[in-house]
């Protein structure tokens, strides 16, 4: 596409090429993790959770009173969650964050003695853990599934998930540019359209 349009620079084409290149970079990183097996995959997604949570907290206003809650989130809950995934303790890693951490973090937040926007601040840390750690940790947790006749090949489930998700992202962009008319959430994502979303989901489902 770039070769055919070399005489006519296009921001849309440049964006698409950038997305595809990012796709290959991510595919390469996941591939390297696969070489190291279970340890590599769990370690990779633990790092992804760490960077995602760090970015989330950076974009979320916090106060000095949140120090102990954030300390627990980064240095206790996150590594504990992935440690449980490593050991395959399903009953614990499915409850650690949505139950135990949700109860303990508000208590830790009170130690700082700061009551300003207390509930809002606590909720942000809680849901940061849910999105960035709990949800992401369930990708390597696929390694713990025991599927009859599929023993030793659980890495393929993660590979399939990554391929479908990345393909959906690229295809949503393509469909959005080809047939996009109605924006989903203009203030949140100016380029996401209803048509692109539907086209991307349906196309990825065919995979």
Positions of PLM-derived features:
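Membrane-embedded alpha-helical bundles of polytopic integral membrane proteins
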Residues: 1-207
């Amino acid at each position: 596409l770039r070769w055919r349009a070399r005489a006519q620079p296009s921001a849309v084409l440049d964006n698409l090429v950038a997305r595809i290149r990012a796709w290959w970079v991510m595919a390469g990183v996941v591939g390297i993790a696969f070489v190291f097996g279970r340890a590599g995959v769990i370690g990779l997604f633990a790092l992804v959770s760490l960077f995602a949570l760090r970015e989330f907290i950076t974009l979320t206003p916090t106060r000095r009173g949140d120090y102990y809650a954030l300390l627990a989130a980064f240095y206790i809950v996150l590594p504990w969650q992935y440690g449980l995934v490593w050991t395959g303790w399903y009953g614990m890693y499915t409850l650690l964050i949505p139950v135990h951490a949700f109860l303990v973090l508000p208590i830790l937040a009170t130690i700082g003695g700061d009551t300003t926007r207390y509930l809002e601040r606590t909720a942000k840390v809680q849901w940061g853990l849910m999105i960035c750690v709990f949800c992401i940790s369930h990708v390597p947790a696929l390694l713990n599934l025991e599927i009859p006749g599929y023993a030793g090949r659980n890495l393929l489930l993660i590979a399939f998930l990554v391929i479908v998700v990345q393909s959906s992202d690229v295809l949503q962009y393509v469909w959005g540019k080809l047939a996009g008319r109605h924006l989903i959430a203009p203030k949140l994502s100016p380029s996401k359209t209803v048509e692109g979303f539907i086209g991307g989901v349906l196309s990825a489902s065919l995979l």
